[in-house]
Amino acid sequence: MSGKQLPMASKTPPALRPKPKRERLPSWFRTTLPSGEQQAIFNSTKAAVKDNTLHTVCQEARCPNIHDCWASGDATFMIAGKECTRGCRFCAVGTIKKAPPLDPEEPSHLATAVESMNLRHAVITVVNRDDLADSGADHYKKCISAVHERKPDVTLELLCSDLAGDHEALAHLLEGSPLSVFAHNVECVPRLDKTVRDHRASFSQSLEILRQAKVLRPDIITKSSLMVGVGERDEEITEALHLLRNAGVDLITIGQYLAPSDKHLAVDRFPEPEMYDVWAKEAIAMGFSGIASGPLVRSSFKAGLLLRKTRDTENSETMPGAYVYVARHENDTPTPLNGGVY
């Protein structure tokens, strides 16, 4: 198994273990802060989010790419609240048993923010709302429609929950939707569901949501994401990629899990950056339309750029720190758009 392997977990009961010392991150996780014009764009993005009383997954999930994305004018908006009704062990988003009512003004606020930021591509993600009969599907649809009505030229990507496996709610959400991308993350390999995710989530349930989305709307690109460093083996990543591709998933991202705090799931390993290139090439060989793979890659990281590259409308901009491949035509050899820069 390549990369930096962390010590095996102790069999001592958690309550009796000494508090572990957090491992120093490998050198390839170094990032730079924005300055000059990029700092000004970062500040403008931050102000647009604050002025419209919105939440972003960039902030709530403590994403390591926040400076890079916000300095480029990119942001992933989080709707339906800032706290989730589930408690996955990897996630920095807050958990709440009884969520507050949905904000009826949120669709309008979201549309205003997207308009003011002059985005080409907007990613909208959600918290789980198991307290709602439709898991929030109708609210998500209203938010998407509001943005499209205000800015029809902006491509839209929804990073959706599993909607508690409700295919009727999914059908309502996707009917007539202007979405370019429907994304839902399986997060980890199937064997690790109980270790990593909330007990109400599973790889199989997530896979069926992705499969059904493609059946309902074959014109919409489907997308998912895998984390590494949560206890998986290299071959399990390959197996999970096969399952996702067989479900009709078009785009995939692979990135390193980083524990938000000592209270979250501990990091198991740090694969070497070159391993992400291996997975990327495997994914394209399986028939995925595109992949971004690298330690700092997250499902929404430069999502618009990956979409444009997949559609062959963007060839100049690169994704430093990621191995990015797209299949230009069926049965083509993989086309590397840029190598990893660390």
Stretches with model-predicted labels:
Residues 80-87:
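Short pre-active-site segment immediately N-terminal to redox-active cysteine/selenocysteine motifs
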Residues 122-142, 231-236:
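Conserved glycine-rich "GG(E/T)P / GGGxP" loop and the immediately following alpha-helix
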Residues 95-122:
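Conserved alpha-helical substructure of the radical SAM core
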